Amino acid sequence: MESIAKAKSLPNKGRTYDSQRPWNRDSPFSFAAWWSTPSTRYLKVDQPSGRDEHDSLDLEDEDVSKYLASHRERQKRRASCAAKAKVLIIGCAVISLFAIIGALGFALGRRATLPGSCASPAHQNPHTPPHPRPTKGEAHDAGHSGSHSSSSSTNNHHHSHDDSPPPPHVGIDKPKQCGESPDEAQSRGCIFEPQLTAWVAPECAFPAVVAEYQDAVGDMMTEWPWFWDTGLQKAVSPEEFPSLQAGNYSVVYTPYQASHALHCLYCWRKVSYALEHGVDWMDARCHQFYHQRHCAFFIADKLLEMEDWRAAAEVDVQGRLTTWTYPLLYHNCVPLSSTMES
């Protein structure tokens, strides 16, 4: 311990050296001294002889070397812990930021689906009472996108389908995906669906349903009577039928009595086709809940108005009375999104 003994013999100003605690605060080898450069440590030795005597200390002393080694090891551990803590803090901050953004997105999404929101139609709780059945006048007054009017041959009732306002939650000011003209619709890849008398965006246009329905009920644009005016005075000529078939017109009118019911049934077929094929999109008219409800009661009222249907019994080819069997059944629920046949 020559270096320590020599350090003890150096004159100092009131400093004491504890041989049992060589690394006390007043020692020239104090813990605080090792944080600075060697030259600075030398200057901290408070003695009249200055640096010359201090430089003669044997800094390679075994005890000093051990302390230096342990001190450097502690420094490395501190630096490693500090780096890990910094990474942990930054990681927590990033995760918290993403959590906040996700929570905000979820809250905005929930708000958009709340009843009364202009972002999407209201979803009715299955445990709440169903919408009240529309009155007979409502069923007659609510129509579809193809503006037309019709009159019944059995009575003098006249009903219009072109002035029905959309429900409050429908965003009528949204930009139209197919534009506002036949040329613009074609340029955007939209498809004309006659039963809707509308150009439909390709994501929710079903050419297969158009062809299927046309095979079942015929080509409405060539087989129904069409007129250019509400007074039914200016008939659409056969030469003009291709324009109707191509969706290249502004507005036409028909007195064909089954037109409204066939339009409603077409929408239902589109919905069932989408469910069957797992399609995620539907045109705005057939998706409209108000329109679906209106169609159901409109067709029901029309059927009940046909007295012959209720009074007359159907007879088969052999002259036997046709009856319809209604056994009491018990149905399970299936996911609405299922594409499996039930």
UniProtKB/Swiss-Prot annotation:
Coiled coil located at which positions?
none
Q: Membrane-spanning residues where?
A: 87-107
Q: Residue ranges under compositional bias (Low complexity)?
A: 144-155
Give the record's GO CC terms: membrane
Signal peptide interval = none
Q: Where is this region: Disordered?
A: 1-22, 118-186
Q: Which UniProt keywords apply?
A: Glycoprotein, Membrane, Transmembrane, Transmembrane helix, Virulence
Q: How does it sit in the membrane?
A: Single-pass membrane protein
The yes or no answer to whether the keyword Cell division is present is no
Q: Where in the cell is it found?
A: Membrane
Q: Summarize the protein's role.
A: Part of the gene cluster that mediates the biosynthesis of the phomopsins, a group of hexapeptide mycotoxins which infects lupins and causes lupinosis disease in livestock. The role of phomB within the phomopsins biosynthesis pathway has still to be determined. The pathway starts with the processing of the precursor phomA by several endopeptidases including kexin proteases as well as the cluster-specific S41 family peptidase phomP1 and the oligopeptidase phomG to produce 10 identical copies of the hexapeptide Tyr-Val-Ile-Pro-Ile-Asp.
Q: What is this protein called?
A: Phomopsin biosynthesis cluster protein B
